[in-house]
Amino acid sequence: VLSGSDKTNVKGVFGKIGGHAEEYGAETLERMFATYPQTKTYFPHFDLQHGSAQVKAHGKKVAAALVEAANHIDDIAGALSKLSDLHAQKLRVDPVNFKLLGQCFLVVVAIHHPSVLTPEVHASLDKFLCAVGNVLTAKYR
């Protein structure tokens, strides 16, 4: 459960990310594919090279979902309901991949905004990303 300070911290991070969300989304995916090559299996039709238009486009979707969740932090489940249905019923993505993506997003934020990612903010952002992952996997059951 996200506390009031967690919510403030998450909104602060997304405020700092600002117009870079799409770029960070693509960078997160590239990092995930490089670090966890097994995640590539869900994208057999993608050009997974650095700077690929397909990775950028999907990164934009990832970023949009995270921004949507942050903007509706009191109702993440409602904000991501359709995306949860898609991943559970059609795409059938292994739930562990959401954790891997979250870890990679934390690294990207740390690279670009090291001073923002204090231990408290890091913990809040991690809790938020876990909450997003839980919402996206809730309909698997």
UniProtKB/Swiss-Prot annotation:
Binding site for O2: H58
A biological process from GO: hydrogen peroxide catabolic process
Pfam family membership, one: Globin
Family matches, as CDD domains: Hb-alpha-like
Domain of life per record: Eukaryota
Keywords tagged on the record: Heme, Iron, Metal-binding, Oxygen transport, Transport
Binding-site list for heme b: H87
Keyword Metal-binding: yes
Tissue expr: Red blood cells.
Residue ranges of domain Globin in the record: 1-141
GO terms under cellular component: blood microparticle; haptoglobin-hemoglobin complex; hemoglobin complex
MF (Gene Ontology): haptoglobin binding; heme binding; iron ion binding; organic acid binding; oxygen binding; oxygen carrier activity; peroxidase activity
Role, per record: Involved in oxygen transport from the lung to the various peripheral tissues.
Family membership noted in the UniProt record: Belongs to the globin family.
Subunit structure: Heterotetramer of two alpha chains and two beta chains.
Protein name per Swiss-Prot or TrEMBL: Hemoglobin subunit alpha-A
Source organism (scientific name): Chroicocephalus ridibundus (Black-headed gull)
